[in-house]
From Swiss-Prot:
Record protein name field: Protein 7.7
Domain of life of the native organism: Viruses
GO function term, MF aspect, one: endonuclease activity
Species of provenance: Escherichia phage T7
SUPFAM superfamilies listed in its UniProt record: His-Me finger endonucleases
Family annotation (InterPro entries): His-Me_finger_sf (IPR044925), HNH_nuc (IPR003615), Homing_endonuclease_His-Me (IPR044930)
Classification lineage: Viruses, Duplodnaviria, Heunggongvirae, Uroviricota, Caudoviricetes
Signal peptide (UniProt feature, chain positions): none
Amino acid sequence: MEDCIEWTGGVNSKGYGRKWVNGKLVTPHRHIYEETYGPVPTGIVVMHICDNPRCYNIKHLTLGTPKDNSEDMVTKGRQAKGEELSKKLTESDVLAIRSSTLSHRSLGELYGVSQSTITRILQRKTWRHI
């Protein structure tokens, strides 16, 4: 396989590149895919066969469903669990978040994570094993 072409600009919290194109924040790997092959269909994601979120080498990109992407992560042993899921939170933090009466916003500020992260914890979409 050819070497990755790594994005050297800004990245998001998950390590994916990000850039502005026509007033919209996009990931470089999706942008290069769409520039090469056209729009990605709704409900489809651009996957990295190299498992490098900063890579935008068109030869390392393929389309799949979110389920395909999740199965690929599990097959390759890249699906984080527990405290590996977020370096910012521990299991005791999650238990405290679930028992708190503070707002999602306040909890996010307190623990240094997004409000949506707090929501996913409270809805047991993440940290389900606790």
